[in-house]
Amino acid sequence: KRIVDLSGNSDILSILGYQVIGTANSDAYDYTKFPSYLKDTLKGAKILGYSMQDTMDIEAVMNLEPDVIVISTVQEKMYEQLTKIAPTIMIQNEALDWKENIHHMAEIFQRTKQAETWLSAYETKAEKLSQSIKNKYGKDTSYLSFLASGGQFFVFSDAGFGDVLYNDLGLVKPKGMPKQSDISLPVVTYEGLAEIDADYIFLITTDEMQKELESN
């Protein structure tokens, strides 16, 4: 099938054995590029926007002549227009459990076996990595991950990379972490960051922002 994915789940579709022709899995800092970890996976796909945007280039979607279009509820207002181009599936992305998105997509595309195989391999890898990290850095060592953009700091608390760190790898969440209840990452100030007592930090940002933070 010729699949256009605007939902941000092009990586999941690749797990299920599909190569999308159009995607919105673009880099959060530069919508014209793929995230580095998806460059090979999405090679050849046309970037149509960013998955957290509620509108995309309708004409560009049409020119790809898709058989199926996948969107999330973020792009709900585009649904009627897109259905005139090709059958359109609208999904609700799970905010706090990315594995549920895999199960959901697998059910829609009838690829549950592929999903289970991938998740089983992932869990085995996560368990081994968890033990390796704890052996090297200690089982009580805490970790913070946040994204710095536009002078704001978005903390991965209970979803995304935070879910991987604290649930999949079983690493320690530092004291002072903000709570997260939906897809929006909690935003903190410089002072808020200082209140989070972490032993190690994973920083996601641009080179320019990193230099600014290091000089502060």
Tell what function each PLM region has.
Residues 7-10, 14, 58, 76-79, ...:
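Extracytoplasmic/secreted envelope proteins and their assembly/folding machinery
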Residues 6-60:
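A short, structured surface patch at a secondary-structure boundary
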